[in-house]
Protein backbone atom coordinates (compact mmCIF):
# COMPACT_ATOMS: atom_id res chain seq x y z
CA UNK A 1 0.00 0.00 0.00
CA UNK A 2 1.23 3.48 -0.88
CA UNK A 3 0.13 6.20 1.55
CA UNK A 4 0.53 9.87 0.73
CA UNK A 5 0.44 12.21 3.74
CA UNK A 6 -0.41 15.80 2.85
CA UNK A 7 1.48 18.49 4.75
CA UNK A 8 1.22 22.28 4.50
CA UNK A 9 2.67 25.08 6.60
CA UNK A 10 0.89 25.26 9.95
CA UNK A 11 -0.51 21.73 9.93
CA UNK A 12 -0.76 20.03 13.33
CA UNK A 13 2.71 18.71 14.12
CA UNK A 14 1.82 15.80 16.39
CA UNK A 15 -0.87 14.71 13.92
CA UNK A 16 1.65 14.37 11.13
CA UNK A 17 4.22 12.72 13.39
CA UNK A 18 1.77 10.17 14.79
CA UNK A 19 0.67 9.05 11.32
CA UNK A 20 4.28 8.76 10.16
CA UNK A 21 5.36 6.78 13.22
CA UNK A 22 2.42 4.36 13.22
CA UNK A 23 2.68 3.62 9.51
CA UNK A 24 6.45 3.13 9.65
CA UNK A 25 6.24 0.89 12.72
CA UNK A 26 3.59 -1.15 10.90
CA UNK A 27 5.84 -1.52 7.87
CA UNK A 28 8.78 -2.52 10.04
CA UNK A 29 6.74 -5.08 11.98
CA UNK A 30 4.74 -6.65 9.14
CA UNK A 31 7.26 -9.45 8.62
CA UNK A 32 6.88 -10.51 12.25
CA UNK A 33 3.11 -10.84 11.83
CA UNK A 34 2.71 -12.19 8.31
CA UNK A 35 5.49 -12.20 5.69
CA UNK A 36 2.83 -12.12 2.97
CA UNK A 37 1.85 -8.53 3.84
CA UNK A 38 3.07 -6.18 1.13
CA UNK A 39 5.32 -3.22 1.99
CA UNK A 40 3.60 -0.13 3.37
CA UNK A 41 5.16 2.96 1.83
CA UNK A 42 4.59 6.47 3.15
CA UNK A 43 5.54 9.69 1.40
CA UNK A 44 4.89 13.37 2.11
CA UNK A 45 2.77 15.32 -0.38
CA UNK A 46 2.68 19.10 -0.41
CA UNK A 47 2.45 22.35 -2.37
CA UNK A 48 6.16 23.17 -1.94
CA UNK A 49 9.48 21.48 -1.19
CA UNK A 50 9.55 22.13 2.57
CA UNK A 51 6.79 22.77 5.10
CA UNK A 52 6.81 23.69 8.79
CA UNK A 53 4.26 22.31 11.24
CA UNK A 54 2.80 23.92 14.37
CA UNK A 55 5.52 22.14 16.35
CA UNK A 56 8.20 23.90 14.25
CA UNK A 57 9.02 20.56 12.67
CA UNK A 58 10.33 20.94 9.13
CA UNK A 59 9.28 18.29 6.63
CA UNK A 60 10.79 17.62 3.24
CA UNK A 61 8.04 17.05 0.68
CA UNK A 62 8.59 13.95 -1.45
CA UNK A 63 5.93 14.54 -4.11
CA UNK A 64 3.89 17.48 -5.38
CA UNK A 65 0.13 17.50 -4.85
CA UNK A 66 -0.33 16.81 -8.55
CA UNK A 67 0.88 13.24 -7.92
CA UNK A 68 -1.71 12.50 -5.21
CA UNK A 69 -3.63 10.20 -7.55
CA UNK A 70 -0.68 7.80 -7.68
CA UNK A 71 -1.26 6.76 -4.05
CA UNK A 72 -3.67 4.18 -2.67
CA UNK A 73 -4.48 6.38 0.33
CA UNK A 74 -4.20 10.14 0.76
CA UNK A 75 -4.19 11.37 4.36
CA UNK A 76 -5.28 14.91 5.22
CA UNK A 77 -4.15 15.92 8.75
CA UNK A 78 -5.44 18.75 10.93
CA UNK A 79 -4.95 22.31 9.77
CA UNK A 80 -3.57 23.35 13.15
CA UNK A 81 -6.58 25.45 14.17
CA UNK A 82 -8.83 25.31 17.23
CA UNK A 83 -11.68 27.70 16.42
CA UNK A 84 -14.24 28.07 13.66
CA UNK A 85 -12.84 31.46 12.62
CA UNK A 86 -9.26 30.21 12.46
CA UNK A 87 -10.34 27.13 10.52
CA UNK A 88 -12.18 29.30 8.01
CA UNK A 89 -9.08 31.47 7.56
CA UNK A 90 -6.89 28.40 7.11
CA UNK A 91 -9.21 26.99 4.45
CA UNK A 92 -8.83 30.21 2.46
CA UNK A 93 -5.03 30.07 2.37
CA UNK A 94 -3.30 29.43 -0.94
CA UNK A 95 -1.82 26.14 0.26
CA UNK A 96 -5.17 24.87 1.54
CA UNK A 97 -6.92 25.79 -1.70
CA UNK A 98 -4.24 23.82 -3.58
CA UNK A 99 -4.90 20.82 -1.33
CA UNK A 100 -8.67 21.09 -1.81
CA UNK A 101 -8.25 21.30 -5.58
CA UNK A 102 -6.01 18.22 -5.67
CA UNK A 103 -8.42 16.25 -3.45
CA UNK A 104 -11.26 17.18 -5.77
CA UNK A 105 -9.44 15.60 -8.70
CA UNK A 106 -8.96 12.21 -7.02
CA UNK A 107 -10.93 9.21 -8.26
CA UNK A 108 -13.13 8.00 -5.41
CA UNK A 109 -13.14 4.51 -6.90
CA UNK A 110 -9.37 4.07 -6.74
CA UNK A 111 -8.04 6.40 -4.03
CA UNK A 112 -9.05 6.28 -0.39
CA UNK A 113 -9.12 9.64 1.39
CA UNK A 114 -8.45 9.65 5.13
CA UNK A 115 -8.77 12.82 7.20
CA UNK A 116 -8.95 13.82 10.84
CA UNK A 117 -9.87 16.82 12.93
CA UNK A 118 -10.01 20.03 10.85
CA UNK A 119 -8.56 18.15 7.89
CA UNK A 120 -12.09 16.80 7.38
CA UNK A 121 -13.19 20.37 6.58
CA UNK A 122 -10.74 20.42 3.66
CA UNK A 123 -12.22 17.21 2.27
CA UNK A 124 -15.76 18.54 2.72
CA UNK A 125 -14.79 21.66 0.74
CA UNK A 126 -14.41 19.45 -2.34
CA UNK A 127 -18.11 18.58 -2.25
CA UNK A 128 -17.41 14.85 -2.25
CA UNK A 129 -18.95 14.27 1.19
CA UNK A 130 -22.60 15.00 0.34
CA UNK A 131 -24.91 12.48 2.06
CA UNK A 132 -21.95 10.51 3.42
CA UNK A 133 -21.15 9.65 7.03
CA UNK A 134 -18.23 11.41 8.66
CA UNK A 135 -16.84 12.73 11.91
CA UNK A 136 -14.57 15.62 12.86
CA UNK A 137 -13.43 17.56 15.93
CA UNK A 138 -16.27 17.45 18.45
CA UNK A 139 -15.82 21.12 19.38
CA UNK A 140 -16.27 22.21 15.76
CA UNK A 141 -19.33 20.05 15.12
CA UNK A 142 -21.85 22.94 14.98
CA UNK A 143 -19.66 24.88 12.55
CA UNK A 144 -19.19 21.80 10.37
CA UNK A 145 -22.95 21.18 10.20
CA UNK A 146 -23.50 24.83 9.36
CA UNK A 147 -21.01 24.72 6.49
CA UNK A 148 -21.83 21.24 5.22
CA UNK A 149 -25.44 20.44 6.15
CA UNK A 150 -25.73 17.48 3.76
CA UNK A 151 -23.02 15.47 5.55
CA UNK A 152 -24.28 12.83 8.01
CA UNK A 153 -22.09 13.92 10.91
CA UNK A 154 -21.43 11.49 13.77
CA UNK A 155 -19.53 13.32 16.50
CA UNK A 156 -19.62 10.38 18.90
CA UNK A 157 -17.56 7.98 16.81
CA UNK A 158 -13.77 8.25 16.75
CA UNK A 159 -13.31 6.83 13.24
CA UNK A 160 -16.04 6.67 10.60
CA UNK A 161 -15.62 4.64 7.41
CA UNK A 162 -17.93 5.32 4.47
CA UNK A 163 -16.70 3.52 1.39
CA UNK A 164 -13.36 5.00 0.35
CA UNK A 165 -13.75 7.89 2.80
CA UNK A 166 -12.29 7.55 6.31
CA UNK A 167 -12.64 10.35 8.85
CA UNK A 168 -11.57 10.71 12.47
CA UNK A 169 -12.20 13.04 15.40
CA UNK A 170 -10.18 15.69 17.18
CA UNK A 171 -6.40 16.09 17.38
CA UNK A 172 -4.94 12.79 18.61
CA UNK A 173 -7.64 10.85 16.78
CA UNK A 174 -4.95 10.83 14.08
CA UNK A 175 -3.57 7.87 16.03
CA UNK A 176 -6.88 6.05 15.63
CA UNK A 177 -7.03 7.05 11.97
CA UNK A 178 -3.56 5.69 11.23
CA UNK A 179 -4.28 2.48 13.10
CA UNK A 180 -7.52 2.04 11.13
CA UNK A 181 -5.51 2.26 7.90
CA UNK A 182 -3.17 -0.45 9.18
CA UNK A 183 -6.20 -2.52 10.21
CA UNK A 184 -7.53 -2.33 6.65
CA UNK A 185 -4.31 -4.06 5.56
CA UNK A 186 -4.22 -6.62 8.37
CA UNK A 187 -6.20 -6.70 11.65
CA UNK A 188 -3.43 -8.80 13.19
CA UNK A 189 -0.81 -6.24 12.20
CA UNK A 190 -2.90 -3.41 13.66
CA UNK A 191 -3.26 -5.31 16.92
CA UNK A 192 0.49 -5.93 17.01
CA UNK A 193 1.28 -2.26 16.37
CA UNK A 194 -1.19 -1.19 19.07
CA UNK A 195 0.59 -3.45 21.56
CA UNK A 196 4.03 -2.22 20.55
CA UNK A 197 3.03 1.43 20.90
CA UNK A 198 0.61 0.89 23.83
CA UNK A 199 -2.40 2.29 22.00
CA UNK A 200 -5.77 1.68 23.63
CA UNK A 201 -8.82 1.14 21.46
CA UNK A 202 -11.02 4.26 21.56
CA UNK A 203 -14.12 3.76 19.42
CA UNK A 204 -15.79 6.96 20.65
CA UNK A 205 -14.85 10.57 21.35
CA UNK A 206 -18.10 11.11 23.29
CA UNK A 207 -16.34 10.84 26.65
CA UNK A 208 -14.12 13.80 25.76
CA UNK A 209 -16.91 16.17 24.71
CA UNK A 210 -17.35 19.18 26.98
CA UNK A 211 -20.68 20.57 25.89
CA UNK A 212 -20.11 24.01 27.37
CA UNK A 213 -17.57 24.48 24.56
CA UNK A 214 -20.07 23.72 21.80
CA UNK A 215 -20.91 27.25 20.76
CA UNK A 216 -24.09 27.48 18.72
CA UNK A 217 -25.61 30.59 17.21
CA UNK A 218 -29.23 29.46 16.99
CA UNK A 219 -31.08 31.55 19.63
CA UNK A 220 -33.61 28.78 20.28
CA UNK A 221 -30.82 26.28 20.99
CA UNK A 222 -29.02 28.80 23.22
CA UNK A 223 -32.20 29.36 25.25
CA UNK A 224 -32.89 25.61 25.33
CA UNK A 225 -29.44 24.94 26.79
CA UNK A 226 -29.83 27.67 29.41
CA UNK A 227 -33.29 26.38 30.33
CA UNK A 228 -32.27 22.76 30.84
CA UNK A 229 -28.94 23.53 32.55
CA UNK A 230 -30.87 25.47 35.19
CA UNK A 231 -33.27 22.54 35.69
CA UNK A 232 -31.16 19.40 35.39
CA UNK A 233 -32.65 18.12 38.65
CA UNK A 234 -36.19 18.27 37.25
CA UNK A 235 -38.02 15.74 35.02
CA UNK A 236 -37.51 16.51 31.33
CA UNK A 237 -40.47 16.90 29.00
CA UNK A 238 -39.60 18.19 25.53
CA UNK A 239 -43.12 19.44 24.82
CA UNK A 240 -43.16 21.44 28.07
CA UNK A 241 -39.73 22.93 27.36
CA UNK A 242 -40.72 23.86 23.81
CA UNK A 243 -43.85 25.59 25.10
CA UNK A 244 -41.82 27.42 27.75
CA UNK A 245 -39.50 28.69 25.03
CA UNK A 246 -42.39 29.82 22.86
CA UNK A 247 -41.83 27.32 20.08
CA UNK A 248 -43.19 23.96 18.94
CA UNK A 249 -41.81 20.56 19.83
CA UNK A 250 -41.05 19.81 16.18
CA UNK A 251 -39.18 23.09 15.72
CA UNK A 252 -37.15 22.58 18.89
CA UNK A 253 -36.21 19.03 17.90
CA UNK A 254 -35.21 20.15 14.41
CA UNK A 255 -33.12 23.10 15.60
CA UNK A 256 -31.33 21.11 18.31
CA UNK A 257 -30.56 18.34 15.84
CA UNK A 258 -29.19 20.85 13.32
CA UNK A 259 -26.98 22.58 15.91
CA UNK A 260 -25.78 19.63 18.00
CA UNK A 261 -26.56 16.50 15.98
CA UNK A 262 -28.49 15.22 19.01
CA UNK A 263 -32.11 14.94 20.04
CA UNK A 264 -33.19 17.27 22.88
CA UNK A 265 -33.37 14.29 25.25
CA UNK A 266 -29.98 13.04 24.11
CA UNK A 267 -28.45 16.45 24.82
CA UNK A 268 -30.07 16.62 28.26
CA UNK A 269 -28.73 13.16 29.11
CA UNK A 270 -25.23 14.22 28.09
CA UNK A 271 -25.50 17.36 30.26
CA UNK A 272 -26.68 15.27 33.20
CA UNK A 273 -23.80 12.84 32.84
CA UNK A 274 -21.36 15.74 32.54
CA UNK A 275 -22.78 17.36 35.70
CA UNK A 276 -22.75 14.03 37.56
CA UNK A 277 -19.09 13.45 36.76
CA UNK A 278 -18.24 16.96 37.93
CA UNK A 279 -20.11 16.49 41.22
CA UNK A 280 -18.48 13.11 41.76
CA UNK A 281 -15.01 14.60 41.29
CA UNK A 282 -15.52 17.80 43.29
CA UNK A 283 -17.91 16.94 46.15
CA UNK A 284 -18.48 14.30 48.82
CA UNK A 285 -22.07 13.67 47.74
CA UNK A 286 -23.24 10.05 47.63
CA UNK A 287 -24.27 8.43 44.37
CA UNK A 288 -27.92 8.72 45.39
CA UNK A 289 -27.54 12.43 46.15
CA UNK A 290 -25.78 13.08 42.84
CA UNK A 291 -28.51 11.19 40.99
CA UNK A 292 -31.16 13.46 42.49
CA UNK A 293 -29.11 16.56 41.62
CA UNK A 294 -29.13 15.58 37.95
CA UNK A 295 -32.73 14.50 37.62
CA UNK A 296 -32.69 10.76 38.27
CA UNK A 297 -34.82 9.12 40.94
CA UNK A 298 -32.18 6.62 41.98
CA UNK A 299 -28.47 5.99 41.71
CA UNK A 300 -28.86 2.80 39.66
CA UNK A 301 -30.41 4.69 36.74
CA UNK A 302 -27.45 7.07 36.72
CA UNK A 303 -24.94 4.22 37.04
CA UNK A 304 -26.58 2.47 34.11
CA UNK A 305 -26.20 5.57 31.93
CA UNK A 306 -22.58 6.01 32.99
CA UNK A 307 -21.82 2.36 32.16
CA UNK A 308 -23.41 2.82 28.74
CA UNK A 309 -21.25 5.91 28.13
CA UNK A 310 -18.11 4.01 29.14
CA UNK A 311 -18.94 1.19 26.71
CA UNK A 312 -19.43 3.72 23.91
CA UNK A 313 -16.17 5.44 24.80
What are these regions (language model features)?
Residues 108-113, 128-133, 164:
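Short active-site oxyanion
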